[in-house]
């Protein structure tokens, strides 16, 4: 599958796959200079890219495992969604969960993009739902 990508600035870096079987494509910070993220704060990190995700798909913006586990940096909304009809700049709302200031450098990998198919659904309002063994059991109801 091809995804059309427009560089909004010459300094932008196209998404890159870290290995042959990686589902995620690295997104890079397109910042002119180092950007600091204070503890427990969020910064919008530009990528310098706009995309044309094919109809029937969306781009999921996920944390990079190393940034999350070693630096305490993750997307503020846990998973960002780039819809197929969005044509603006892709940005990463990066949150610092740590207790120290973190620095984002120009060209640094800040998140990963996974292009995912989805189904369009129609919601029908009903009076009752079918019974199941689980029923209304919620959080933790299926055991550890």
Name these PLM-found stretches.
Residues 1-144:
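DUTPase catalytic domain/fold
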